[in-house]
Amino acid sequence: MGFLIAYVFNLSPCSGDEMFETIGLAIIHFEGLNTNRVSKCNQNWHQESKQVAMELIQKVSQGLWELENCDTVNSVVVLGKEYPPVPEQRQEERHENGVNMFQHIFTRQGRWNEEFLADVHTRLHFTYRTRFVPIPRHPNGPSPMSISVMLRDNPLNVIENVLNNPDCFQTDIGWGCMIRTGQSLLANALQRACLGRDFRIDDNAANEHELRIIKWFEDDPKYPFSLHKFVQEGFSLSGKKPGEWFGPSATSRSIQALVAKFPACGIAHCVISTDSGDVYMDEVEPLFRADPSAAVLLLLCVRLGVDVVNEVYWEHIRHILSSEHSVGIAGGRPSSSLYFFGYQDEHLFYLDPHKPQLNLASYQQDLDLFRSVHTQRFNKVHMSDIDPSMLIGILLNGKDDWQLWQQHIASSQIIHLSDSKPVDLMLDHQLESAILGDRYLSEDGQGPSSKVDTGDYIDVGSFVPCTDSSCKINESEDEYQDVKCKNQRIVVVGETTTNGSPEVEVEKVLVEKETIPVRSK
């Protein structure tokens, strides 16, 4: 029998004052522990402990007291709104105004622009939740019980989950942070679309229209943007099992699908790019021709470096966040996502989802629910310290916004506008969709499978839209090809023709074995 007691501290992030807070206490009870199994568990324990330690280090950087403004020179920007800095008061002025050392430590008043603080406080912020409607574990997926959960959740919640739902997830601690930052991005886009950019909350009275948006994210399968719906779409579209960490691509696919299934949300369309910052005019302009006032959400998954963000992109990240059309960036650190909503000089402001709270349905009063998704605590990180993989959100409220935004990002090195998707890229995406997109349960019913194995040759000829002027089938140029090809075909893209489309030729090709024909829809 044994006990492990873990204390978690916060450290003030600004200045050299070492101020600590015990923000968590976890007591783990080991009864009847088989010592012969300890060595077998060491590796898994080490990996999970390492992840927990990284999260704790991140928390230590946040501080018990609110973030102080150490920069009194540079202005601050929140999703396209710029606020001037507040010069630091001299010590004697603080005394004259009755601001003693105690108040200096425990308050931020006078440190930040008050309008800036009101804007930050208005941002919708979703975090880890506990005790929500159970999500069944996938047979081949992660276990609901992990070191992260045992250390960070309330011990009573852990015990209750073990006793009542041992094969279900009732918290997303340790794996749901990218989903939560994706929810934050989507929620702030919905807030902007429904209430406008100048909307500000009253901390003493919940706004009825915003409450409706908040409840769409309640962690129950019946709500359109719940964690459960994200997990469901993540499995269907990206093969993500419950308990597995999402990346930007899986998150963007889930958001796109959920928005399409709930047109009453206020966003008419969601256009995504899962591998670049490329936006294609022929995908967006038809949406505004059909409805000039349509709200369109763009989600761009980009990678701006290998291990860290390349410095050449720093200014362009600031430029994106300075746009009035920006609804934030979901990203952060490897396996530890943050929601970025603004910047000051070379630091990005963010909201951290790694704070466990009770699920939204547990709040009896609307005001308590409302306050659980609005925080006055935020932090900042230098751009050299963030992960290069991120999800950029842009909201265009109608055709006029679309035209203004095009001008704003004309010089961007991250986002690029093109008339249409290149033919070779279209073929890549069509092949990917044919091979991976139509997922279905395998024979054992355990998970998504594909009709094509990765080792097979693929006949791509059927994917090419042929016309008399732009495409021709080269059946056989010599006897050797005609005998040995077995009807396998490749696509050859030639010069652009006079009508603007590339000349496409489908040829037979010699390979080692028969291909598997994959038909386009």
From Swiss-Prot:
Catalytic residues of the enzyme: C177 (nucleophile), D352, H354
Function statement: Cysteine protease that plays a key role in cytoplasm to vacuole transport (Cvt) and autophagy by mediating both proteolytic activation and delipidation of ATG8. Required for selective autophagic degradation of the nucleus (nucleophagy) as well as for mitophagy which contributes to regulate mitochondrial quantity and quality by eliminating the mitochondria to a basal level to fulfill cellular energy requirements and preventing excess ROS production. The protease activity is required for proteolytic activation of ATG8: cleaves the C-terminal amino acid of ATG8 to reveal a C-terminal glycine.
Name by which UniProt lists this protein: Probable cysteine protease ATG4
Primary residence: cytoplasm
Subcellular location: Cytoplasm; Nucleus; Preautophagosomal structure
Catalytic activity as recorded in UniProt: [protein]-C-terminal L-amino acid-glycyl-phosphatidylethanolamide + H2O = [protein]-C-terminal L-amino acid-glycine + a 1,2-diacyl-sn-glycero-3-phosphoethanolamine
A GO CC term assigned to this protein in UniProt: phagophore assembly site
Keywords, sorted A to Z: Autophagy, Cytoplasm, Hydrolase, Nucleus, Protease, Protein transport, Thiol protease, Transport
Entry-linked PANTHER family: CYSTEINE PROTEASE, CYSTEINE PROTEASE ATG4
Single Gene Ontology MF annotation: cysteine-type endopeptidase activity
Transmembrane segments: none
Swiss-Prot/TrEMBL GO biological process terms: aggrephagy; autophagosome assembly; cytoplasm to vacuole targeting by the Cvt pathway; mitophagy; piecemeal microautophagy of the nucleus; protein processing; protein targeting to membrane
EC number, UniProt record: 3.4.22.-
Family membership noted in the UniProt record: Belongs to the peptidase C54 family.
